[in-house]
């Protein structure tokens, strides 16, 4: 544990951000998994789940969780699965 006051605060804020980022990342991954499952089963709600997953990916980019090219690649792959 750090002794300097500013370092103590940095540890606290890092923990807060880490937990927030982890929940965002988890929600993004869950949305992608739900879409993959629906697309594999040719479910009726696959289009809605695709839109939801795309929103989660865009949100992750705006929050700095993933790179914009990573999101674009994932969205492209999801769209290809939806088209099949």
Curated annotation (Swiss-Prot):
Q: What is this protein called?
A: Small ribosomal subunit protein bS20
Q: What is the originating organism of this protein? A: Listeria welshimeri serovar 6b (strain ATCC 35897 / DSM 20650 / CCUG 15529 / CIP 8149 / NCTC 11857 / SLCC 5334 / V8)
Q: Which Gene3D superfamilies match?
A: Ribosomal protein S20
Region described as Disordered: spans on this chain: 1-28
Q: Does the keyword rRNA-binding apply?
A: yes
Taxonomy of origin reads:
Bacteria, Bacillati, Bacillota, Bacilli, Bacillales
Its function? Binds directly to 16S ribosomal RNA.
**Per the similarity annotation, which family is this?**
Belongs to the bacterial ribosomal protein bS20 family.
GO terms (BP aspect): translation
State a GO cellular component annotated for this protein. Answer: small ribosomal subunit
- What keywords does the record list, in alphabetical order? Ribonucleoprotein, Ribosomal protein, RNA-binding, rRNA-binding
- Which domain of life does the protein's organism represent? Bacteria
The molecular function terms in GO held by this entry are: small ribosomal subunit rRNA binding; structural constituent of ribosome
């Amino acid at each position: 544990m750090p002794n300097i006051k500013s370092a103590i605060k940095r540890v606290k804020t890092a923990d807060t951000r880490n937990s927030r980022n982890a929940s965002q990342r988890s929600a993004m991954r869950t949305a992608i998994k739900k879409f993959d499952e629906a697309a594999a089963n040719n479910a009726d709600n696959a289009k809605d789940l695709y839109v939801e997953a795309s929103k989660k990916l865009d949100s992750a980019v705006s929050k700095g969780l993933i790179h914009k090219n990573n999101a674009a690649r994932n969205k492209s792959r999801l769209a290809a699965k939806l088209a099949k």
